[in-house]
């Protein structure tokens, strides 16, 4: 039976008890409205720890002024059932006062330079500062040995890894594989915003990522790969924030042309269809 905890002292007592027994503890941070991708992270964490804590907290500091904080779906009962089925031991449900005891205006910010300042960092200024700030607080609250994050948010995972390395958090960071719908659309809590007309079009993102991979392998120059991807998405109705072919650390390759022998790459896309913003990526 999953334990639901809303009091920080109770959470710390639970985790302290586990650690006194020599048990390893994992954390899976979420914002709720969970789906199979989230549950796969719980199952991944279970492979590296004896106990798994998942947090559900819709973090106001990572939403921009024109973003969807107010309408972000909250489904606590369904989340709890799904987490229990996935093997989660405890559900941590902090409120805003617990997470930000001095208020969000006085919250000590954390910024991960470089990796936070490109791609999503340009499109959503301050977003990753909010992510780092809340994740650092969750790390301090739960004191996990392991934490799992999804690779669908590729840049977020890179930001978290940099923060953990720089601030010497004694936490192993796991990256969970992207879980997809049958047509290739990456699972996301925001997919439910898609209209009936937009839903089939959304699967084109995955197809364009595969085209980017194949073009790179064929030696097409990087800028041409990105331009063709943008054109393909716009042709079916997307408004494109970016298409990018990057090194795994998200820096731009210094070779003007693609070079498959030069090492791994990651293709990343952020685009809007209707009122819904979707992100996805492909490592190769």
UniProtKB/Swiss-Prot annotation:
Subcellular location: Cytoplasm
Top-level taxon of origin: Bacteria
Binding-site residues for ATP, renumbered to this chain: 31-38, 150-153, 179, 187-190
Binding site for (R)-pantoate: 62, 156
A Gene Ontology biological process term: pantothenate biosynthetic process
Keywords attached to this entry: ATP-binding, Cytoplasm, Ligase, Nucleotide-binding, Pantothenate biosynthesis
UniProt cross-references to Gene3D superfamilies, sorted A to Z: HUPs, Pantoate-beta-alanine ligase, C-terminal domain
GO cellular component: cytosol
InterPro entries named in the record: Pantoate_ligase (IPR003721), Pantoate_ligase_C (IPR042176), Rossmann-like_a/b/a_fold (IPR014729)
EC code: 6.3.2.1
Pathway given in the UniProt record: Cofactor biosynthesis; (R)-pantothenate biosynthesis; (R)-pantothenate from (R)-pantoate and beta-alanine: step 1/1
Database matches in CDD domains: PanC
Residue positions of the active site: 38
Positions of beta-alanine binding: 62
GO MF annotation terms: ATP binding; pantoate-beta-alanine ligase activity
Reaction it catalyzes: (R)-pantoate + beta-alanine + ATP = (R)-pantothenate + AMP + diphosphate + H(+)
Family matches, as Pfam families: Pantoate_ligase
Subunit and partners: Homodimer.
Misc: The reaction proceeds by a bi uni uni bi ping pong mechanism.
Function: Catalyzes the condensation of pantoate with beta-alanine in an ATP-dependent reaction via a pantoyl-adenylate intermediate.
Family: Belongs to the pantothenate synthetase family.
Cross-referenced HAMAP family: PanC (MF_00158)
The protein, known as: Pantothenate synthetase
Name of the gene this protein is made from: panC
């Amino acid at each position: 039976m999953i334990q639901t905890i809303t009091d920080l002292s109770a959470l710390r007592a639970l985790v302290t008890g586990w650690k006194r027994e020599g048990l390893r503890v994992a954390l899976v941070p979420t914002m709720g409205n969970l789906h199979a991708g989230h549950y796969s992270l719980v199952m991944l964490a279970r492979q590296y720890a004896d106990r798994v804590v998942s947090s559900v907290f819709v973090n106001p500091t990572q939403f921009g002024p024109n973003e969807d904080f107010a309408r972000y779906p909250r489904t606590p009962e369904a989340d709890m059932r799904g987490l229990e089925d996935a093997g989660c031991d405890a559900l941590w449900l902090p409120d805003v006062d617990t997470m930000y005891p001095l208020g969000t205006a006085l919250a000590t910010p954390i910024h991960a330079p470089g990796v936070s300042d490109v791609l999503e960092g340009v499109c959503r200024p301050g977003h990753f500062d909010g992510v780092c700030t809340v994740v650092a607080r969750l790390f301090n609250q739960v004191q996990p040995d392991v934490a799992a994050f999804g690779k669908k948010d590729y840049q977020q995972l890179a930001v978290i890894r940099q923060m953990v390395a720089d601030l010497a958090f004694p936490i192993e960071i796991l990256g969970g594989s992207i879980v997809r719908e049958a047509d290739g659309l990456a699972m996301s809590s925001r997919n439910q915003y898609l209209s009936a007309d937009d839903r089939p079009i959304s699967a084109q993102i995955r197809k364009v990522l595969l085209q980017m991979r194949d073009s790179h392998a064929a030696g097409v120059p990087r800028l041409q790969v990105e331009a063709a991807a943008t054109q393909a998405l716009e042709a079916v109705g997307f408004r494109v924030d970016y298409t990018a072919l990057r090194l795994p650390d998200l820096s731009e390759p210094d070779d003007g042309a693609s070079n498959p022998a030069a090492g791994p790459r990651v293709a990343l896309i952020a685009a809007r269809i209707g009122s819904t913003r979707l992100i996805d990526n492909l490592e190769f």
